[in-house]
Amino acid sequence: VYAVSNGTGNLEVSDFALSISGGSAQLSSATPTSISKQGNVYTLGIGLSSPASGVETGTVNPVADSVFDLAGNISTTNQSNNSIQLNDRLGPSITGIVIAGNNASVDVTLAEAAYPGTANSGALTVADWVLSIPDTNSTAKLGSATPTSISKNNNVYTLGLNITGTPDGNETLVVNPAANSIYDALDN
């Protein structure tokens, strides 16, 4: 294929338009970030501003009047074999947090199975979590940013809390994964 109707010219990123539907991933640009060719196969780079969850469908179309065959026939912008499901690149996300009535623990629900490394094995530990109460005006404080204990039931992790002082109900407990500590089965 060629960029000019007389059978000359190399294809460029501007000869293609990208789109995504479904899921949460967003394109950073509808124009590919790169292009390379090997034989009849063109590899286009896709710029995403957020990771794909695996339910998105990516579509590639030639831009109008930009792709030709040797005989000068123009490629249609409406293709039928130009879509593919994107791979899951989204790590486990927290979908729910419920604190115990006595403030001794918090249940953290993850959207999928989680592991402490990229080997898809092992159990999460207290070191995989970071806790905080960012309200500096509160008399309630955390004794440690690390949970005191951990237990698991399916994808619900119960983290033990060491709260000093008396909470008045206006505090916010923040639960985050420690840096580079919680992965899904696809090593995200």
How would you describe each model-predicted region?
Residues V1-N188:
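Non-catalytic beta-sheet/beta-sandwich ligand-binding modules that flank or precede catalytic cores
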